[in-house]
Swiss-Prot record:
GO terms for molecular function: translation release factor activity, codon specific. InterPro entries: PCRF, Pep_chain_release_fac_I, Pep_chain_release_fac_I_sf, Prokaryotic/Mito_RF, RF-1. Keywords: Cytoplasm, Methylation, Protein biosynthesis. GO terms for cellular component: cytoplasm. The modification N5-methylglutamine is found at Q235. It holds the Pfam family RF-1. Peptide chain release factor 1 directs the termination of translation in response to the peptide chain termination codons UAG and UAA. It is found in: Cytoplasm. It comes from Edwardsiella ictaluri (strain 93-146). This is Peptide chain release factor 1.
Length: 360
């Protein structure tokens, strides 16, 4: 490994020990904000620290084995140990390179998940419902909380559009590669001839950012409409104009929220989603202007970004970005997504590593 990388790892190791000591300090424990910030930093440094300590240990083992090569009685054993240590060293160096990759500061945040029915009418709305259920199951398995912010139900079930907040450690970092077009091929329940129909949905995932970090929105740029909510809610539905529709005039972004009975709460929820959408649009524009020729595995949430095809007759799901096909569609629809998410995360890391190599 390059001396500059080793020096960086030594500095991180020292900081890990320093933070560990600070977390035991009474003054730090009394300051809850600082304690929380240091706890997060400690958690982020722990993996790289442990990996670097393991790398150092293997380096020591390697040196010991090389010294034993001069001893005729120990040579065979030393050669075996050398082979094993070199293999382990290569593995640890690869892990350390990945751990040192620049982190997306949004990765640890909660996120907003939007699923919208596209082409395909009722069948697209039903599939949007299936996708939302799939993500909900995945969130439950990871002990994340999922809260519907706004939903427009399809006439025959499912959703025309559903927006939810997913709260939990690393929710955005795990789900961010889901943005884009999701296509389904299956025989609809209403199809009497048994013909396979193709319909589509779009998914958009945006980090939920604290209000202080959101773009400043000029109230004069907003048009706010109120209307009577529809859908579930019993006697309280359609009795007051509690539903809110906010239009951001400069961008044309529209957010609706009718989940709460209180107009004030619906407005607060809609504003948080609007801020996240405006921020996401600004970041996407900036990335486009930087116009990297390198492929971007992070979809824009546009249907033109083909993410996956879910083929029910064949029981397969295909990720078009990395040409990955799995014949485990039933498991995937039940929320077992790690076999799809992990390869795309690894591919993204490989792209980052090759970008760093080109810069050196």
């Amino acid at each position: 490994m390059k001396p500059s990388i080793v020096a960086k790892l030594e500095a991180l190791q020292e900081r890990h020990e320093e933070v560990q000591a600070l977390l035991g300090d009474a003054g730090v424990i009394a300051d809850q904000d600082r304690f929380r910030a240091l706890s997060r930093e400690y958690a982020q440094l722990t993996d790289v620290s442990h990996c670097f300590l393991a790398w150092r240990q293997v380096q020591d083992d390697l040196t010991t084995a090389e010294m034993l090569l001069d001893d005729p009685e120990m040579r065979d054993m030393a050669q075996e140990e050398l082979k094993e240590a070199r293999g382990r060293l290569a593995e640890l160096e690869q892990q350390l390179q990945i751990l040192l990759l620049p982190k997306d500061p949004d990765d640890e945040r909660d996120c907003f998940l939007e699923v919208r029915a596209g082409t395909g009418g009722d069948e697209a709305a039903l599939f949007a419902g299936d996708l939302f259920r799939m993500y909900s199951r995945y969130a439950e398995a990871r002990r994340w909380r999922i809260e519907i912010m706004s939903a427009s139900e399809g006439e025959h079930g499912g959703y025309k559009e559903v927006i939810a907040r997913v709260s939990g450690d690393g929710a955005y970092g795990r789900l961010k590669f889901e943005s884009g077009g999701h296509r389904v091929q299956r025989v609809p329940a209403t199809e009497s001839q048994g013909r396979i129909h193709t319909s589509a949905c779009t998914v958009a995932v945006m980090p939920a950012v604290p209000e202080a970090e959101l773009p400043q929105i000029n109230p004069a740029d907003l048009r706010i409409d109120t209307y009577r909510s529809s859908g579930a809610g019993g006697q309280h539905v359609n009795t007051t104009d509690s539903a809110i529709r906010i239009t951001h005039l400069p961008t044309g972004i529209v957010v609706e929220c009718q989940d709460e009975r209180s107009q004030h709460k619906n407005k607060a929820k809609a504003m948080s989603v609007l801020g996240a959408r405006i921020r996401a649009a600004e970041i996407a524009k900036r990335q486009q202007e930087e116009a990297s020729t390198r492929r971007n595995l992070l979809g824009s949430g546009d249907r033109s970004d083909r993410v996956r095809t879910y083929n029910f007759p064949q029981g397969r799901v295909t990720d078009h970005r990395i040409n990955l096909t799995l014949y485990r569609l039933d498991e995937v629809m039940e929320g077992k997504l790690d076999n799809l998410i992990e390869p795309i995360v690894q591919e993204h890391q490989a792209d980052q590593l090759s970008a760093l190599a080109e810069q050196e």
